[in-house]
Amino acid sequence: MKVKVFDLNGQPVGEIELPKVFFTPFRPDLIRRAVIASWTHRIQPQGRDPMAGKRRVTENIGKGHSMARVERLKTPPRYAAFVPFARGGRRTHPPKVEKIIWEDINKKEKRLALMSAIAATANYDLVRARGHIIDNVPQLPLIVVDDLQKVQKTRETREIFKKLGIWDDIVRAKEKSGVRAGKGKMRGRRYKKAKGPLIVVGKNEGIVLGARNHPGVDVVVVDNLGVEHLAPGTHPGRLTVWTVSAIERLRELYG
């Protein structure tokens, strides 16, 4: 199947044969597992000192003294110690480094998940269901000449995105971003940022500098492409712009 290739003015300048990866069956179950595996592998195991709260010489005085039968210090002041509800006592169920926190996925399943996520970027229904505005996008998948990789100025990329029809989605991402509700504001997660278009290039020749200041826009080299780029939050169908060299590299990697 052949699709059009567009220049930086949004005009078709040729055609290209789509790689077979764009016809991979939709597998939302594998995509979800792959994204969660990516999330959990960024978590660092944590634990507590096994002796924390236990470095005390205590005794239990037993019953018959009109006092709670808890461990107390042997020397004055004879306050409670060691037990979980005492000041400086141990924790009841502390976190342990042995806890299994990583979700694993088989290599072939991970590869199929990535291929399925790539194919989902060409599905109009999935892209709309994800919330992207594609009314002015000429086609999906949107393929652009390699000149896009060399643009280094934000004002230039803004005009290019307007001509390619993806600027409305960037505006949507800006309007949906804002201060988070709840306690997360105090815990290093003050702002919620919506995801906008993804730019996939064959080689970074300056486009990262030109696109990084646009709200919600991400740029990634095709060799570093992951399921999390294509399906943020486990939801496939992200609006994606491909360069010609990225498409050719996909053909080499996935057929």
UniProtKB/Swiss-Prot annotation:
One of its GO terms (molecular function) is structural constituent of ribosome. InterPro entries: Ribosomal_uL4, Ribosomal_uL4_dom_sf, Ribosomal_uL4_euk/arc_CS, Ribosomal_uL4_euk/arch, Ribosomall_uL4-arc. The keyword Nucleotidyltransferase does not apply. Coiled coil: none annotated. One of its GO terms (biological process) is translation. Keywords: Ribonucleoprotein, Ribosomal protein, RNA-binding, rRNA-binding. One of its GO terms (cellular component) is ribosome. Belongs to the universal ribosomal protein uL4 family. One of the primary rRNA binding proteins, this protein initially binds near the 5'-end of the 23S rRNA. It is important during the early stages of 50S assembly. It makes multiple contacts with different domains of the 23S rRNA in the assembled 50S subunit and ribosome. NCBIfam families: rpl4p_arch (TIGR03672). Part of the 50S ribosomal subunit. This is Large ribosomal subunit protein uL4.
